[in-house]
């Protein structure tokens, strides 16, 4: 029995598509990294995800303020739509939640 050095990977579960057109839109490296991370996080049926700025920051290696700036740029280009969410705490108070990101088709 021959063993592989690399474990078998499920092509649907372990990979996500990054459209080729993303490289012809004039995005900088940070915007591409953020867009790719949001695609990684998205639900493929609803095209939505809700990672925090801190989580995105840890994943791509940029500060949360820089993430915010580049997300606004991606919104202006029509690649993303963001919606605020609300969270109700145990004591009944409402607080701001993470943004809900909807990935728009290219």
Question: What function would you assign to each model-found segment?
Answer:
Residues 1-66, 72, 94:
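Short recognition helix of helix-turn-helix/winged-helix DNA-binding domains
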Residues 65-106:
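Winged-helix/helix-turn-helix nucleic-acid-interaction surface
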